[in-house]
Structures are given as structure tokens and as C-alpha cells.
Amino acid sequence: MAASVGRDERLRLFLAIRLPEPAVEALAGWQARELHGRVVPPENLHVTLAFLGSRPAGELPVILGVLERAAADAAPLRLDVTGYRESRSVGMLTLADEAGATAALAERLHAELEQLGVYRREARRWLPHVTVLRFRERPRLRPEPPSLGWMSSDAAAFLSRLHPPSPAATAARYEVLDSFRLGG
């Protein structure tokens, strides 16, 4: 845990699969060619497994324990880009989840964290994706998705710090609090 964080402080947390550097570089190049607006910076690209929201810092050891055990029991994950779609506020690349392994990892985290009272399941179905663009007004882009796939070998707990967005900057900065190798 960051040294400057007190036990009673609230942390905006999420658990995610980190992308390998070659995939991050390829996606950043694709974003520069195909997207316009507030693109997600390369250092913020990830596949969210569980968004926990604002949690007391004292819960972090329990959350990290759940992530560590789940990651140890999972194998490295094969993810492939299948398309681009937009929701009300984000553009995302959807991913094929080989053999449902990523969905199984997400489901395990959701169930265990929910049982511990540190997570509330979202109403919508979990979808493996990488958020690549944020917007206030849906641009209705139709970019050709990149032909890209990768193996991801670790999962991490992230701290999300919100800042007012500017035309050149994203509204959030993410900090890895801890990461765990998939398969131990």
C-alpha cells in the first residue's frame, strides 16, 4: 500500500489484467490513427476484472489476498480484439476470451469479494474489453479494429486518482498497488 495512505482513507480501486508492452504500443498506434477526442493514454490501458469504487484503505489487504489467490489459480490469458463499440461515455475494443478463462477469473473475484462485503456486482453482464476512448457526446465512430491478440500474465490492483479533465489529459491517473502473476 502506498506509504501516504492512512487506514481510514478511502481509495478508488479496481482489479484488472495488465496488457503486455507490445500490445500497449500497438493499441496506442491504432488509437492515434483511428480515434479522435479524449483517447485513453497508453499507461491506462487494461482489462477491468472488477471495479470496487471507493473503499476504506483498511480493506486493501483483504482485497489483495483475494486477487493473489485467484491469480495463482488462473493460467496466463489469451485475449484477441474482436471489434469496436461505444457505450454512453466510452469507446471500447471488445475481446475474445479463449475458453472463458478471463470470465472465470472475473466471476471468481466478483463472488469472493461480494461474499466479503467489499464488492457489489454490477447489473450489466461483465464483458472483456479495453476502454480506448472517453467522451461526453457519443461520436459514433466506426474504426476498423486492430488485428491484435496477446497473452496476459498478470493481474493487478489499481488505485484510480481522479483529476479534472483537460483537452490534452485524461481525468484519471492509475497507480498499480500490487500485481500477481497468473498461475503463481
Please tell me what each predicted stretch does.
Residues 1-184:
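Histidine-dependent nucleotide/RNA phosphoesterase domain, centered on the 2H-phosphoesterase fold
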